[in-house]
Structure formats: C-alpha cells, structure tokens
C-alpha cells in the first residue's frame, strides 16, 4: 500500500487551532503501518469525549467544541480518520473500504485505550463510530448521534445524497473548503476554508475523500450491510444514554434521527434536540453541542 503523508508545514498557523498533535501507529491487514493523528485536550481524569468527524473534514471541525468541553472539566479526544487531516493517506482509492476504516479506528481505539467514553459522531464519524460502539460497548458510556446513520441498504437515497454522490465521483477537483462552507449555514472565513484544504496539497491526497460517498451501503449489494445489521442488533439492546442532535438544515440526513429514537432503548426519555445548522452542524452550533455533551455526562456519571 502506497501511503502519502501531508507535510507538517501545511498545518502551521491555522485559525483557532492551537492544539498539539498526537499520533498512534496502527497496522493494516497487509502489514502497512499507518499513522493516525488525534487531539487530546483536558484533564486525564475528565470524562473522555470522543469527537468523530466525517467526509471530507478533519478534527478541525471540533475546534470550537474542544475548548468548551475542556472548560467544563472534560477530556476531548478528536481523531482524524485515515485519509483525512494529519492522518496518513493511502494513495490508491481502492485501498479505502468500509471494513478497513472500522479496523483502523478499532486499532486506534484500543491503542489509546478509551474507557467510559462519550461519543459524538457526525457523517462518516457515525458510520464508523457506531460500529466501534457495537464492537466495544464496554468502552462507551453514552452516545450523541448527529447528521449520520448506520445504513443497511434499505430505503431510498435522499436527493441530497444522490447529488453529492454524483458530484464527488465526477468533479475534476474536489473543493474541500468550498464544500465545508456550502454545508454550513454560517459563512466560513477564507482562513477557515483554507484550514479545511490544508490536509490536501493536491488531488492525489483526496482519494479517501473521493471514495467515502461510494462506500455508504445504500443498497443491499454494498459491502458493510451485514456488519451494520449486526451493529444494529447491539444498538437495539443498548440501554446507556443515546441522544439525537440532528440539524434543521441538512438535506442529506433529514429524518435520520427517527430509527435511533425508535430502536435504541437508551434513547427513550432522552432530551433529543434539533440544532440550528447545515450538514456540518459543528460549525453552526458548537456551544449547543458542547452543552449537550456536558449535560449528558453530568446526568449519567
């Protein structure tokens, strides 16, 4: 497996990003070593909050949430998925599979040894993060699900996702910062959009971002359907808190909160919310997200 690594200087002087990088090496099934980046802020004895980003962002998406969690006494951990941020990037699009993403982040989770964690997941952060919850339920104390899902090939794609799938596979240059701006209600600054572009010096670094939309198991023929069905079985017995926090302006995941509220025992009686924002709700409602997580932790500890 050929692996690219974004030069460190691409991440120097980013707006609102004072956090020191931390790294874990994981081994792929083919023997390739991959370096995964994460941010780890706050007291070691604070409640660990795992903040998982999705397509095509990186941990920078949580820059306005991390300090709020730390100020509340919690520990904030935000990894970059393989192919994104400061994590290593396989150069061949075919090297990115749903199963591999789950395996890579499973190895990372075991290496950092999170226990009693509270997961906040959005977009592919949910498709991967919820699989981690299903595989390691003993490591998690609660979950907040936002603008994501755990698809099993049934139902129709939203028009928003169809358009995104078509665009992502055909556009000559994938405009990462532009996409983050378009998926947020507020207008991102030029510096913020540049920070989202930073992990990708050129198109060769974007194979993971190109591949993610095609990996979503929207049909029964997609890889990952059986594994997601098995994960749902675990979630259908999950009695720890699960809160939905979808946004009011995301055409891609509209209505996605319903199965979580209906099928997960731990979702009953929880203070589910609809947040103001687009697909990247972390950009639009960071204070509300941090407050929601703080409340969840204080209720359940």
From Swiss-Prot:
Segments traversing the membrane: none
Substrates-to-products reaction catalysed: 1-haloalkane + H2O = a halide anion + a primary alcohol + H(+)
Enzyme Commission number(s): 3.8.1.5
Highest rank taxon of the organism: Bacteria
Keywords for this protein: Hydrolase
UniProt cross-references to Gene3D superfamilies, sorted A to Z: alpha/beta hydrolase
Catalytic residue list: 123 (nucleophile), 250 (proton donor), 279 (proton acceptor)
Record-level Gene Ontology MF annotations: haloalkane dehalogenase activity
The UniProt record lists the keyword Hydrolase: yes
Pfam families per UniProt: Abhydrolase_1
InterPro entries referenced in this protein's UniProt entry, alphabetically: AB_hydrolase_1, AB_hydrolase_fold, Epox_hydrolase-like, Haloalkane_dehalogenase_1
Enzyme class per UniProt: hydrolase
SUPFAM superfamilies tied to this protein: alpha/beta-Hydrolases
Subunit and partners: Monomer.
Function, as annotated: Catalyzes hydrolytic cleavage of carbon-halogen bonds in halogenated aliphatic compounds, leading to the formation of the corresponding primary alcohols, halide ions and protons.
Family (UniProt): Belongs to the haloalkane dehalogenase family. Type 1 subfamily.
Record's protein name: Haloalkane dehalogenase
Species for this entry: Phenylobacterium zucineum (strain HLK1)
């Amino acid at each position: 497996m050929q692996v690219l690594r974004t030069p460190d200087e691409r991440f120097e002087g980013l707006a609102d990003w004072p956090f020191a990088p931390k790294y874990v090496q994981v081994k792929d099934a083919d023997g390739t070593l991959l370096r995964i980046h994460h941010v780890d802020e706050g007291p070691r004895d604070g409640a660990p909050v795992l903040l998982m980003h999705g397509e095509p962002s990186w941990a920078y998406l949580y820059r306005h949430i991390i300090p709020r969690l730390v100020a509340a006494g919690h520990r904030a951990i935000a990894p970059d998925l393989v192919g994104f941020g400061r994590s290593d990037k396989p150069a061949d699009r075919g090297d990115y599979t749903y199963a591999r993403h789950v395996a890579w982040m499973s190895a990372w989770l075991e290496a950092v040894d999170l226990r009693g964690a509270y997961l906040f997941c959005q977009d592919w952060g949910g498709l991967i993060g919820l699989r981690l919850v299903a595989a390691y339920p003993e490591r998690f104390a609660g979950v907040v699900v936002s603008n994501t899902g755990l698809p099993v090939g049934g139902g129709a794609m939203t028009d928003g996702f169809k358009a995104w799938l078509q665009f992502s596979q055909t556009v000559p240059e994938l405009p990462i910062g532009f996409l983050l701006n378009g998926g947020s209600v507020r207008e991102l600054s030029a510096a913020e959009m540049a920070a989202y572009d930073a992990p990708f010096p050129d198109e060769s670094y974007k194979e993971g971002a190109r591949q993610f939309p095609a990996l979503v198991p929207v049909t029964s023929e997609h890889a990952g359907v059986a594994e997601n069905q098995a994960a749902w079985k675990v979630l259908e017995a999950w009695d720890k808190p699960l809160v939905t926090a979808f946004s009011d302006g995301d055409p891609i995941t509209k209505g996605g909160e319903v199965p979580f509220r209906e099928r997960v025992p731990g979702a009953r009686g929880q203070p589910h919310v609809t947040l103001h924002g687009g697909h990247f709700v972390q950009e639009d409602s960071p204070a509300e997200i941090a407050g929601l997580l703080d409340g969840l932790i204080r209720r359940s500890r």
